């Protein structure tokens, strides 16, 4: 008779959990197994739950480790234990799905047994799905940008946040960038939080125009991109303590601001983080004690709009938003071959141009943007 697949029984948070294929290698370069992943999340559960607990989580599964195919799973498996909590989440498409809401170390271990290497929580609590309690500042470097520049932009973010009454909590992304989280009072909608994130991105760009950018289109970016769209509904970001699918099994590490200058993303792995956690505890332990108001950033956004800076492009799978600019990258936009203004109904060209000058006097703001090619004097219409 064929032998049964290998498994191991763990007791986590008072619950019995069967880990299937515990010796399966998930990180070939380091030899880390599924059991190593499960034990990592149990070791840092207090911090990981502060980051991802009580929130709907999208499952990101790597059944054959980081070198195999992975997939995103929004719906919680039907075969889940009865003690796994779920909440029904509605997406921008109008569809709904029951997503997993981890509440204890056992739930994290159960997710890890599904080969969920990463924790991808939504920025809302299961008790209030319409009002995010997290502003996520994603510092995403363009190719070729070094770690020192990323840290410099993080320091600018650190200096900017207090000007708007905000407290920031930095962490490594676990990849190339840094994240800064801000806990929010639960009173703003997703569009408002995204609008605030866009205003912050533009303010950081204004303060450091050679280092940072808020431009959505990759061809327009330079330096470090502040990805404001990570705050749109249905977007998730790898949480603090989340493992990342890198050969060295690094993790997203919560930091104190005093650690930014000397830290390196490679310092934090599933091997080193439990030791750090046991020694220092959670560097974000007080994050929930500092919920902040978005009023300052929303005032800045309103000022931007008065100055002509409206909305910026949304991700491609979102419906076209009111006030959103063209969702076409600049190099593919077709230049109009037609003039913006045609001047007619005058038999003499000088009379037509005089009428045009009167129009410019009445509309000085629009006139300031006109180029010579934008104006056509149509003598035929004046006859």
Model-derived regions, located:
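Basic, low-complexity intrinsically disordered segments
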Residues: 58, 63-135, 141, 203
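C-terminal accessory nucleic-acid interaction domains of nucleic acid-metabolism proteins
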Residues: 1-31, 38, 49, 53-54, ...
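Short, charge-patterned binding micro-sites
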Residues: 56-72, 172-185
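Short beta-strand
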Residues: 59-62, 168-174, 214-218, 376
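Extracytoplasmic
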Residues: 334-335, 348-383
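Signature for HUH/AEP ssDNA processing cores
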Residues: 100-173, 184-192, 331
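Short structural boundary motif marking the start of a folded domain
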Residues: 335-341
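Short, surface-exposed ligand-recognition loops at beta-strand->loop->(often short) alpha-helix junctions
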Residues: 144-146, 343-351
């Amino acid at each position: 008779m064929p032998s049964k697949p290998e498994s191991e029984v763990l007791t986590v948070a008072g619950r019995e959990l069967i880990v299937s294929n515990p010796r399966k290698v998930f990180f070939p370069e380091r030899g880390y197994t599924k059991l190593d992943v499960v034990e990592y999340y149990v070791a840092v559960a207090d911090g990981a739950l502060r980051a991802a607990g009580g929130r709907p989580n999208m499952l990101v599964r790597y059944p054959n480790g980081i070198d195999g195919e992975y997939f995103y799973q929004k719906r919680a498996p039907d075969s889940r234990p009865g003690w796994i909590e779920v909440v029904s989440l509605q997406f921008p498409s109008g569809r709904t799905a029951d997503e997993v809401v981890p509440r204890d170390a056992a739930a994290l271990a159960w997710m890890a047994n599904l080969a969920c290497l990463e924790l991808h929580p939504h920025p809302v609590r299961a008790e209030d799905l319409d009002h995010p309690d997290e502003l996520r500042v994603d510092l995403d470097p363009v190719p070729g940008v070094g770690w020192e520049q990323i840290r410099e932009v993080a320091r600018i973010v650190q200096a900017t946040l207090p000007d708007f009454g905000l407290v920031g909590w930095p962490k490594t992304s676990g990849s190339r960038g840094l994240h800064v989280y801000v806990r929010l009072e639960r009173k703003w909608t997703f569009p408002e939080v995204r609008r605030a994130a866009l205003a912050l991105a533009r303010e950081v760009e204004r303060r450091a125009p050679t280092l940072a950018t808020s431009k959505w289109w990759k061809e327009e970016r330079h330096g470090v991109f502040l990805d404001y769209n990570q705050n749109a509904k249905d977007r998730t970001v790898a949480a603090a303590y989340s493992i990342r699918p890198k050969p060295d099994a690094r993790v997203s590490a919560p930091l104190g601001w005093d650690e930014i200058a000397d830290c390196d993303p490679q310092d934090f792995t599933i091997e080193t983080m439990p030791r750090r956690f046991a020694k220092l505890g959670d560097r974000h332990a007080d994050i929930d004690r500092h919920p902040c108001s978005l009023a300052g950033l929303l005032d800045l956004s309103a000022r931007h709009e008065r100055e002509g800076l409206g909305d910026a492009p949304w991700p491609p799978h979102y419906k076209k938003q009111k006030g959103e600019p063209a969702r076409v990258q600049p190099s593919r936009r077709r230049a109009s071959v037609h003039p913006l203004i045609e001047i007619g109904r005058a038999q003499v060209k000088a009379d037509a141009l005089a009428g045009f000058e009167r129009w410019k006097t009445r509309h000085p703001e629009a006139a300031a943007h006109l180029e010579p090619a934008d104006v056509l004097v149509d003598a035929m219409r004046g006859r």
